[in-house]
Amino acid sequence: MDDLLAELKSEMDAAGVDADVEFSLPTLELTAALDATIDDTSQLYTDDPPHHYTDTPLTGDDLPLLEAWLDDAQLHGVGDDIIAEYIDEVLLVLITVRGGACGKELLQDVRRLFGADVSPGTMYPHLKQLADAGLLEMSELTKRKVYRVADAQAAIEHVDSVVLQLLTFAVGLQTIMADCIVNQSADPQPQDE
């Protein structure tokens, strides 16, 4: 893998890409898996509802796409209020990665990925709204409902749009904060005597 990274870096240098880029194996695996998911969305859902559904715990072995992120301290540092604010996007990503999930699995996934305790009273209305909006399909089984992505491209575009807005906001806020720090250090407040 190191040879591939070195080859990629040298190709970037030869192409005149002027950037200090660092690669890590989990980042590349996640990016490659995401690219494969976006290119081949046919496996994300099926047209026929399943006849039998078995709970599958979210593990690194079962879902290599999220392996680098499971039990990650940075993700566990995200506040429950932020998770609740963006629960639609979180649910769409988790259901897309899984290819389908029931509510119990999604609650466990959110807890495992983010350390957040989202209540069923918060999550289930959002699943219904996503289904009503045509982003999810819901199959009713004997003891549970299974949610699948109805239109993978629409789901990806929705999440991508929200993520872009969040990144733009975060970069803008961080830039303003950096300017404030620079201005304060350049113009110290007079001390009271």
Curated annotation (Swiss-Prot):
Residue ranges, annotated region (Leucine-zipper): 153-184
GO MF annotations in UniProt: DNA binding
Binding site for DNA: 143-148
UniProt note on regulation of activity: Degraded once GvpD is translated; degradation requires 'Arg-494' of GvpD; tested in transgenic H.volcanii. Fusion of green fluorescent protein to its C-terminus partially protects it from degradation.
Highest taxon above the source species: Archaea
Keyword tags: Activator, Cytoplasm, DNA-binding, Plasmid, Transcription, Transcription regulation
Induction / repression: In PHH4 (a deletion of the p-vac locus) detected starting late in exponential growth, increasing in level by stationary phase and remaining at that level (at protein level). Transcribed in all growth phases, maximal expression in mid-stationary phase. An unstable 6kb transcript able to cover gvpD-gvpE-gvpF-gvpG-gvpH-gvpI-gvpJ-gvpK-gvpL-gvpM is detected, as well as smaller transcripts. Not translated in strain PHH1, which has an intact p-vac locus. Gas vesicles appear earlier when grown in static culture, possibly due to O(2)-limitation.
CDD domains linked: HTH_ARSR
Gene3D superfamilies referenced in this protein's UniProt entry, alphabetically: Winged helix-like DNA-binding domain superfamily/Winged helix DNA-binding domain
Major site of localization recorded for this protein: cytoplasm
Role, per record: Plays a regulatory role in gas vesicle synthesis, required to activate transcription of the c-gvpA operon. Gas vesicles are hollow, gas filled proteinaceous nanostructures found in several microbial planktonic microorganisms. They allow positioning of halobacteria at the optimal depth for growth in the poorly aerated, shallow brine pools of their habitat. Expression of 2 c-vac DNA fragments containing 2 divergently transcribed regions (gvpE-gvpF-gvpG-gvpH-gvpI-gvpJ-gvpK-gvpL-gvpM and gvpA-gvpC-gvpN-gvpO) allows H.volcanii to produce gas vesicles. All site-directed mutagenesis is tested in H.volcanii.
Quaternary context: Homodimer. Interacts with endogenous GvpD, also with GvpD from H.mediterranei.
Note: Encoded in a 14-gene locus called c-vac which produces cylindrical gas vesicles only in the stationary growth phase.
Protein name: Transcriptional activator GvpE2
Organism encoding this protein: Halobacterium salinarum (strain ATCC 700922 / JCM 11081 / NRC-1) (Halobacterium halobium)
Encoding gene per record: gvpE2
